[in-house]
Each structure stands twice: as C-alpha cells, then as structure tokens.
Amino acid sequence: MNTQRKSKHLKTNPTIVASSSEEVSSLEWEEIAMAQEEEDLICRMYKLVGERWDLIAGRIPGRTAEEIERFWVMKNHRRSQLR
C-alpha cells in the first residue's frame, strides 16, 4: 500500500527528484563565490586527490562537497569557453 501511495505521489508531483545522482543544469546553478585562499586550496587539493569533493570539503570550513564541486565545474567550464 505504501508503494502505491509513493508511486502516485511521484506521478502527480513533477518536482520530486527520482534519483540523487541526477545532474542539475548549469542554468539552475548560482555562482559560488570563493575567497582566493579557498580557490588556491581547492586547486592544490584537486591536484592531490582528484574529484574527491568530500575530502576537499573537509579542509574548507563551512563549505559542502556539492558547493566545491559546483564551483570547480563552473570555473573550468568558463575557462574552456575562453579558449
């Protein structure tokens, strides 16, 4: 019975995300402002550990892994457009 109610709810409410792994388009992202020190640390950590955003976020107080990944993607997307 609970699964029937859940599937009905998913059909009537299109704003529910079916999977946490879905990507959000860049149009829905707000630009993340980072201090220069944060940017430097993100760049250095990325060179060391790659896309381990949780690990990088653990070194920057007040920042989530999602914010750092979004910042990285947007920053590198802008660089590729400038080339």
UniProtKB/Swiss-Prot annotation:
Q: Which biological process annotations from GO are given for this protein?
A: negative regulation of trichome patterning; root hair cell development
Q: What else is known?
A: Overexpression of ETC1 results in the suppression of trichomes and overproduction of root hairs, as observed for CPC, TRY, ETC2 and ETC3.
**Superkingdom per UniProt:** Eukaryota
Q: Where is the Myb-like domain?
A: 35-72
Give its localization. Answer: Nucleus
Q: In which tissues is it expressed?
A: Expressed in developing trichomes and non-root hair cells.
Entry GO MF terms? DNA binding; DNA-binding transcription factor activity
Listed A to Z, the keywords are:
Developmental protein, DNA-binding, Nucleus, Transcription, Transcription regulation
Species for this entry:
Arabidopsis thaliana
Major localisation:
nucleus
What InterPro entries does the entry give? Homeodomain-like_sf (IPR009057), Myb_dom (IPR017930), Myb_TF_plants (IPR015495), SANT/Myb (IPR001005)
Q: What does this protein do?
A: MYB-type transcription factor involved in epidermal cell fate specification. Acts as a negative regulator of trichome development, by mediating lateral inhibition. Promotes the formation of hair developing cells in H position in root epidermis, probably by inhibiting non-hair cell formation.
Task: Write down any Gene Ontology CC term.
Answer: nucleus
Q: Which SUPFAM superfamilies match?
A: Homeodomain-like
Question: By what name is this protein known?
Answer: MYB-like transcription factor ETC1
